[in-house]
Amino acid sequence: MGKLRQIAFYGKGGIGKSTTSQNTLAALVEMGQKILIVGCDPKADSTRLILNTKLQDTVLHLAAEAGSVEDLELEDVVKIGYKGIKCTEAGGPEPGVGCAGRGVITAINFLEENGAYDDVDYVSYDVLGDVVCGGFAMPIRENKAQEIYIVMSGEMMALYAANNIAKGILKYANSGGVRLGGLICNERKTDRELELAEALAARLGCKMIHFVPRDNIVQHAELRRETVIQYAPESKQAQEYRELARKIHENSGKGVIPTPITMEELEEMLMDFGIMQSEEDRLAAIAAAEA
């Protein structure tokens, strides 16, 4: 068994991060890789398609029921899913109470101390990325996740979140070994989406790993709580995820320290692509409409 690769999928809420990560990991396990998924999103939906079940009980929830995390056994929190993928969800507190990041820290420490990382090739963290607060940045900050893949699209807020996540990676890149593996663009069919994703990758100094086309088969599979790899293994979309998995597998050691841009530079880039109007153009358009 080679060196353990600790990867993380970050991205803004609703971008399709959990779906993309689970389909990619299902493709990786087909390639003979042994995988542990650590869900770090309070929604606790990072393992649903691999386990083919409703939401998994989280480490924090089980610890609260048992009395403390020390009262848990590894088999209480790790479930086995598609082709032997190990799955666990860190979980988070009740909305409005406490820090969700604390659950991530508690869960990862428990898993490491109890041998969950011992016989796997990949540990994959699925992390909420709108807020790069201390807790959610923990897999980066504590030098756990070494390769970060940002799931984004051509939408303004997805680009903004991707740049913000790159800032978080840069902050910890020198003190730890964390690197940006690259961008994964989940197609939303916005204008000039692939070009825009490639332009942002160039500005961040990283690769555009893969452009995942939009396909309704993803939703059909999700309704059955399955990945596309499991639901429609011969489909074109399954091949896209296999290609993405292959690119990530071959990207070992090729991550970069990102070069995030300012908000002004991001807006300028969007203007260059005609996605966003400058204030002058906006006012001119209003004046023309009123004339």
Curated annotation (Swiss-Prot):
Enzyme class per UniProt: oxidoreductase
Cofactor detail note: Binds 1 [4Fe-4S] cluster per dimer.
Post-translational modification: The reversible ADP-ribosylation of Arg-102 inactivates the nitrogenase reductase and regulates nitrogenase activity.
EC number: 1.18.6.1
Any one Gene Ontology molecular-function term assigned to this protein's record: ATP binding
Essential cofactor(s): [4Fe-4S] cluster
Residue positions binding [4Fe-4S] cluster: 99, 133
Purpose of the protein: The key enzymatic reactions in nitrogen fixation are catalyzed by the nitrogenase complex, which has 2 components: the iron protein and the molybdenum-iron protein.
Family, as annotated: Belongs to the NifH/BchL/ChlL family.
Official protein name in the record: Nitrogenase iron protein
Source species: Cereibacter sphaeroides (strain ATCC 17023 / DSM 158 / JCM 6121 / CCUG 31486 / LMG 2827 / NBRC 12203 / NCIMB 8253 / ATH 2.4.1.) (Rhodobacter sphaeroides)
Lineage: Bacteria, Pseudomonadati, Pseudomonadota, Alphaproteobacteria, Rhodobacterales
